[in-house]
């Protein structure tokens, strides 16, 4: 049984490649086929558990549209997933590392920007971990020349990831982009949990 500050289990469950192929094939107009690949970082990078994420359309996983680094931090009765992204001039050093982890030896904290307001609060539900972006509309994104705030959440088990990824209008809360038809449903197709180092 896990619990709300079990960073080791969360890291093991997150470590893998996830695909929503079944969802995309069942309803192509609503769902693109996306792959999310998360690789464990060496423990010393963040002084604790961390993962590197690349998210891409399955047709071109060599050109991910989202690069993130997560530091899993137990805090009181929950965990925080602290978000970082590579600076624009460092992206080429990172791109591809989720599928070629030897590249991670060249990762450097100096290449990263923190993402204020975008960290996620993670708790244990009894059967899964659930995460929601911290309250306050602070995770701002400009898309289609319009400012939005991220309204993100996820639920993860040892073999599946369900996520909602939306941008909302800061004033009206109207959904401007993202998961309009509901949650993305990803299955783990490659398991990297064996790469998670004890801490």
Curated annotation (Swiss-Prot):
Provide a GO biological process annotation. protein-phycocyanobilin linkage
Q: Which UniProt keywords apply?
A: Lyase
Does Lyase count among this protein's keywords?
A: yes
UniProt-listed Pfam families:
CpeT
Keyword Signal set for record: no
Q: What class of enzyme is it?
A: lyase
Molecular functions per Gene Ontology: lyase activity
Q: What's the EC number here?
A: 4.-.-.-
Q: What happens when the gene is disrupted?
A: Cells are a yellow color, 40% reduction in phycocyanin and grow slowly. The C-phycocyanin beta subunit (PhcB) in this strain is missing the phycocyanobilin chromophore on position 153.
| Its biological purpose | Attaches a phycocyanobilin (PCB) chromophore to 'Cys-153' of the C-phycocyanin beta subunit (PhcB). It does not attach chromophore to CpcA, ApcA or ApcB, the other phycobiliproteins.
| Family, similarity comment | Belongs to the CpcT/CpeT biliprotein lyase family.
Name of this protein? Phycocyanobilin lyase CpcT
Q: Which organism is it from?
A: Picosynechococcus sp. (strain ATCC 27264 / PCC 7002 / PR-6) (Agmenellum quadruplicatum)
Taxonomic lineage is:
Bacteria, Bacillati, Cyanobacteriota, Cyanophyceae, Oscillatoriophycideae
């Amino acid at each position: 049984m896990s619990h709300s500050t079990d960073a080791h289990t969360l890291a093991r469950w997150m470590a893998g490649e996830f695909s929503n192929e079944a969802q995309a094939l069942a309803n192509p107009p609503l769902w693109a086929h996306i792959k999310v690949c998360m690789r464990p970082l060496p423990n010393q990078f963040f002084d604790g558990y961390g993962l590197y994420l690349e998210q891409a359309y399955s047709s071109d996983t060599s050109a991910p549209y989202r690069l993130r680094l997560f530091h899993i931090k137990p805090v009181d009765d929950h965990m925080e997933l602290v978000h970082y992204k590579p600076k624009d001039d460092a992206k080429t050093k990172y791109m591809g590392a989720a599928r070629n982890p030897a590249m991670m030896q060249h990762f450097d904290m100096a290449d990263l920007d923190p993402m204020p307001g975008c960290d996620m609060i993670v708790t244990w539900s009894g059967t899964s971990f659930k995460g929601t972006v911290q309250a306050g509309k602070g995770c701002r994104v400009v898309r289609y020349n319009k400012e939005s705030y991220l309204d993100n959440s996820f639920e993860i088990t040892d073999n599946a990831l369900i996520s909602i990824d939306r941008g909302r209008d800061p004033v009206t809360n109207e959904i401007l982009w993202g998961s309009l038809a509901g949650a993305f449903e990803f299955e783990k197709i490659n398991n990297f949990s064996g790469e998670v180092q004890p801490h």
